[in-house]
Design a protein with these regions (language model features):
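Short, low-complexity N-terminal intrinsically disordered segments enriched in polar/charged residues
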Residues: 19-56, 165
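Short beta-strand edge/turn micro-motifs at domain boundaries
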Residues: 113, 132-163
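Hydrophobic/aromatic beta-strand elements that line small-molecule binding cavities or substrate pockets
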Residues: 98-104, 118-120, 135-141
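Short, cysteine-centered beta-strand-loop-beta hairpins and adjacent loop/turn segments enriched
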Residues: 90, 120-130
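Bacterial Sec-dependent N-terminal signal peptides
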Residues: 1-27
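Short beta-strand segments enriched in hydrophobic/aromatic residues
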Residues: 57, 118-120, 153-154
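A short hydrophobic beta-strand element
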Residues: 110-120
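A solvent-exposed, acidic/Ser-Thr-rich amphipathic alpha-helical stretch
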Residues: 50-107, 131
Length: 165
């Protein structure tokens, strides 16, 4: 019985030590790091910097990237990068304006999710096009002290209600 009691106390003691040694997460610092990734995402598009854009995404093979065009579905950053390289080749100017940015973080500081509304202005072959209110949502994950996008979805709202409710 003494052995069980000592074993119990030992387990309790080591459990307490391991729990109390956990470092406290500075959520404001994590928030700033996530915002930096999102800022780089925007900056990469404006500068047509494919390397910077790819650095915003996770290297994991099971990420999800959904664009506004019907065929824009990628499950890895390499194939998205190939398509984006072609797109950058056709754009003379890319300008983004972000508003209504919302960012949430898990209390453990390892997962973040966001929403932002983005206005896109592009020039191609002397022709300007503007796409207002592109809704962009996504999830970032912190792995090896680096935040990266693991899921992103962009959509264009339609005018009016498709179905009245």
């Amino acid at each position: 019985m003494k052995l069980l009691y000592r074993l119990f106390l030992s387990i309790l003691f080591f459990s307490f030590i391991s729990c109390s040694n956990q470092t406290e997460v500075n959520l404001e610092e994590e928030r700033q790091q996530v915002m930096e990734v999102l800022d780089n995402f925007v900056k990469a598009h404006e500068e047509k910097d494919l390397d910077m854009l790819l650095s915003c995404f996770s290297d994991k093979p099971d990420i999800t990237i959904i664009g506004t065009d019907r065929d824009e579905l990628w499950v890895d950053k390499v194939s998205m990068g190939d398509a984006q390289k072609r797109a950058y080749g056709t754009f003379d100017v890319v300008k983004l304006s972000v508003r209504d940015k919302i960012l949430k973080l898990c209390t453990n500081g390892e997962i973040a999710w966001f929403y932002m509304k983005v206005n896109w202005s592009v020039e191609s072959e002397g022709k300007s096009s503007t796409f207002d209110g592109i809704r962009t949502t996504g999830v970032l994950e912190k792995t090896n002290d680096k935040w990266a996008i693991v899921q992103i979805h962009t959509s264009m709202p339609i005018e009016g209600q498709a179905v009245r409710y």
